[in-house]
Amino acid sequence: MALMILPFIGALSVSESLVAVVTVCLVYLIIKSFQDKIPEGLSRLPGPKPLPIIGNVLEVGSRPYLSLTEMGKRYGNVFQIQIGMRPVVVLSGNETVRQALIKQGDEFAGRPDLYSFRFISEGKSLAFSTDQAGVWRARRKLAYSALRSFSTLEGTTPEYSCVLEEHISKEAKYLIQQLDTVMKADGSFDPFRYIVVSVANVICGMCFGRRYDHHDQELLSLVNLSDEFGQVVGSGNPADFIPILQYLPNKTMKKFVSINDRFISFVQKIVSEHYATFNKDNIRDITDSLIDHCEDRKLDENANVQMSDEKVVGIVNDLFGAGFDTISTALSWSVMYLVAYPEIQEXLYQELKENVGLDRTPVLSDRNNLPLLESFILEIFRHSSFLPFTIPHCTTKDTSLNGYYIPKDTCVFINQWQINHDPELWKEPSSFNPDRFLSADGTEVNKVDGEKVMIFGMGKRRCIGEVIARNEVYLFLAILIQKLHFCNLPGEPLDMTPEYGLTMKHKRCQLRATARVRSDH
């Protein structure tokens, strides 16, 4: 975050800088003078002392999940920092976060009115918008219903239990063919490059009823846009935290707006095509389902929340964007961990060989018979914590947590990385050990421990696509492990250092994938 703000200030002229600094200082002093009074019986939030204008950005640094975890050791599970001029409450610890997001869920269910959020899906994003509770709940319910109904529809042939299973199985098989072609031509492959297109095709099938070739320029362009979006959002936008910067030239903000405009244009085009060919008696995909809802029921069951056509585009945009970025990141990390721990990769293959066999493709119903694979996925979620924070929350009223007063409209960061690496929850948290989730005899997954892993948020803002995401990661991975063996290039060490963003990616690299030969039987 500091890295985003400081270069921007340096780019201003001396006169511009002077005006900006004086103005911001005056506003800062005025705000400080009207600071909230603490109600009797409650305490003021602890935290590091902020500098004028930039707050605590220097202490937060370029890896906030680590620096805020360290601050939590000093100040506790509820503390306050200041980013620019905006106070931010940071929550850590499983019990504290559970108290805030579940037991006091309504009070922490808001989204902060950040300047950059207004440009995501033209301000109509389900995930980022500051819609009032009634509007947001109606849209969330609609999106969840559409996701669930289309993921559980019967497949086109008896071979598949549902549409989701069919899409994943077909794309996984196509991915294996692509990797075989690339390996023969180049001798190595970039895991993220090929996985992300396969995952994007699954969500394209669900949302739009179509798939794209792995070399389709339109889809590749969108994949790159999504990656850029995650980097910009994850880094923090200076204008979100120093309001005066909204009115000054800002290259980062200009790039951010351009990314969102191009993304929404792609979705608008497809939604328009769906409107033109819409047939109420032939609902083809999630987009058709949402259109049908708008045509039939402009109001929800309480007759007080209108669902506009524009917000349909926003919902589809959210489902599409989040649907491939999160899952492709999880799968790409999974392949990296397979390479980093070859003995675990072999044990996973043996589990598949014994419980599924090698003569058929794994299916969703095999999942309960593959406890090592399930624990491997849980440990990837925990150890990588590739979603280190949830999307920022916001308090909807004056409230308190752990005895500390938190005013209405306070921005709240949830440190998922800290929970997943908390030594009070996990033995040797820095070690990668899937066995931590297995029963003593290795035949069952400890569901209580599994639920402690935080990657999809919690409570009212929990990711609506979580069940689909978990199923997709499992089935893609099961098919890949059954058919391929992954390793790194000779003499090239594997770099598992994450690159910070909204979703933390591993560094781009080249790996090898070889088909499991007949002798493996």
Curated annotation (Swiss-Prot):
Its main location: endoplasmic reticulum. GO terms for biological process: hormone biosynthetic process; progesterone metabolic process. Keywords: Endoplasmic reticulum, Heme, Iron, Membrane, Metal-binding, Microsome, Monooxygenase, Oxidoreductase. Its cofactor is heme. It catalyses: an organic molecule + reduced [NADPH--hemoprotein reductase] + O2 = an alcohol + oxidized [NADPH--hemoprotein reductase] + H2O + H(+). One of its GO terms (molecular function) is iron ion binding. It is an enzyme of class 1 (oxidoreductase). Substrate binds at residue 229. Heme binds at residue 463. Its EC number is 1.14.14.1. It is found in: Endoplasmic reticulum membrane; Microsome membrane. Coiled coil: none annotated. It is a peripheral membrane protein. Signal peptide: none annotated. It comes from the Eukaryota. PROSITE patterns: CYTOCHROME_P450. InterPro entries: Cyt_P450, Cyt_P450_CS, Cyt_P450_E_grp-I, Cyt_P450_E_grp-I_CYP1, Cyt_P450_sf. GO terms for cellular component: endoplasmic reticulum membrane. It holds the Pfam family p450. Cytochromes P450 are a group of heme-thiolate monooxygenases. They oxidize a variety of structurally unrelated compounds, including steroids, fatty acids, and xenobiotics. Belongs to the cytochrome P450 family. This is Cytochrome P450 1A1. It comes from Chelon saliens (Leaping mullet).
